[in-house]
Amino acid sequence: MLVWLAEYLHQYQSVFNVFSYLTVRAILALFTALLLSLWIGPKVIRRLQILKFGQEIRNDGPDSHLSKKGTPTMGGIMILFAIGVSTLLWANLANPYVWFCLFVLFGYGAVGFVDDYRKITRKNTAGLVARWKYFWLSVIALISAFGMYAIGKDTDATRLVVPFFKDVMPQLGLFYIVLAYFVIVGTGNAVNLTDGLDGLAIMPTVFVAAAFALIAWATGNIEWSKYLYIPYIKHTSELVIFCTAIVGAGLGFLWFNTYPAQLFMGDVGSLALGGVLGTIAVLVRQEFLLVIMGGVFVVETLSVILQVGSYKLRNGKRIFRMAPIHHHYELKGWPEPRVIIRFWIISLMLVLLGLITLKLR
């Protein structure tokens, strides 16, 4: 929004041209989202406490989690607010990719909001009925996938980028929609499953978003895209603003979510952040890279799938003491901060590994 104002004022004062630079707007988007989160955080916590919107705890979980009961949840509202305001202020709103991300962010956030609200009002961890939850997540993902395909049809924007192979970029055609659907829905649920300890999900999200900011910039820059042998997609450069807004909002939320947490993001935050990371991965054509950089999310999801499969196929036998896998380590006796920090370290290493693969082609 402010890009248009800066372009107008540039006619009268050249100094306003600085706001047209992508790097300047990206940094300002980060700090805007960060400061907004820090500003509204205490207000959100107080309001949630007044409304008695507290976290419900599973009875079969680690005993250490019982003390978390009643901690304000649905803090993802402040993350979405900070990202939304920052993006609307600093991104070029004529860019369709920005709107796809905002649509998924708030669409998935709305589904998560209903899920959280039902958990709170019904005083259990069941939430929204699974079939309806996945129905609405699927509708939002498919609308986005069809829209993205319509814009990028038969261009480099619908090619499949395979790590390590610079000449392997097949045109996906309609399969682009199928891939986009599974990436968006899958990532949304993966981040949701990871969000089980204080700060566990938000920091890997920040790492991945920061990496995608660099990738979006390179993909939207014709010289760098040629240098890295990745498709040049002109609309992706504005996703840098969206990614840095995620980083800022995420760090602001972590201020209140670090152990012991004063606030949980809830499904309204985890589903929204996961869904939008999946959307960004599709838009910059780096779905495989998301699997690498978001390895913590992948492992958490696989641990649940394997646990459920083992329980059903092996007459109640479990692979892990509890799934997702972060609870397994808690039940082994690891203190919660140790689990969190080690998962952060692994996440950072995987993000760096993912970035390195861009050059190893």
Swiss-Prot record:
Pfam family of the protein (one): MraY_sig1
Catalysed reactions listed for this entry: UDP-N-acetyl-alpha-D-muramoyl-L-alanyl-gamma-D-glutamyl-meso-2,6-diaminopimeloyl-D-alanyl-D-alanine + di-trans,octa-cis-undecaprenyl phosphate = di-trans,octa-cis-undecaprenyl diphospho-N-acetyl-alpha-D-muramoyl-L-alanyl-D-glutamyl-meso-2,6-diaminopimeloyl-D-alanyl-D-alanine + UMP
Q: Where mainly located?
A: membrane
**What EC class does the entry list?**
transferase
One GO term describing the cellular component: plasma membrane
Q: Does the keyword Transferase apply?
A: yes
Q: Which GO terms describe its molecular function?
A: metal ion binding; phospho-N-acetylmuramoyl-pentapeptide-transferase activity; UDP-N-acetylmuramoyl-L-alanyl-D-glutamyl-meso-2,6-diaminopimelyl-D-alanyl-D-alanine:undecaprenyl-phosphate transferase activity
Cofactor(s) this protein cannot do without: Mg(2+)
The residue ranges crossing the membrane are 21-41, 74-94, 97-117, 132-152, 168-188, 199-219, 239-259, 264-284, 288-308, 339-359
Q: Which UniProt keywords apply?
A: Cell cycle, Cell division, Cell inner membrane, Cell membrane, Cell shape, Cell wall biogenesis/degradation, Magnesium, Membrane, Metal-binding, Peptidoglycan synthesis, Transferase, Transmembrane, Transmembrane helix
How is the protein disposed in the membrane?
Multi-pass membrane protein
List the pathway annotation: Cell wall biogenesis; peptidoglycan biosynthesis
Q: Which GO terms describe its biological process?
A: cell division; cell wall organization; peptidoglycan biosynthetic process; regulation of cell shape
User: Where in the cell?
Assistant: Cell inner membrane
- Under Enzyme Commission nomenclature, its number is 2.7.8.13
Could you tell me which InterPro entries the record lists for this protein?
Glycosyl_transferase_4 (IPR000715), PNAcMuramoyl-5peptid_Trfase (IPR003524), PNAcMuramoyl-5peptid_Trfase_CS (IPR018480)
Give the signal peptide as a residue range, or say none if absent.
none
Report the family membership. Answer: Belongs to the glycosyltransferase 4 family. MraY subfamily.
Function noted in UniProt: Catalyzes the initial step of the lipid cycle reactions in the biosynthesis of the cell wall peptidoglycan: transfers peptidoglycan precursor phospho-MurNAc-pentapeptide from UDP-MurNAc-pentapeptide onto the lipid carrier undecaprenyl phosphate, yielding undecaprenyl-pyrophosphoryl-MurNAc-pentapeptide, known as lipid I.
**PANTHER family attached here?**
PHOSPHO-N-ACETYLMURAMOYL-PENTAPEPTIDE-TRANSFERASE, PHOSPHO-N-ACETYLMURAMOYL-PENTAPEPTIDE-TRANSFERASE HOMOLOG
> What is the protein name stated in its UniProt record?
Phospho-N-acetylmuramoyl-pentapeptide-transferase
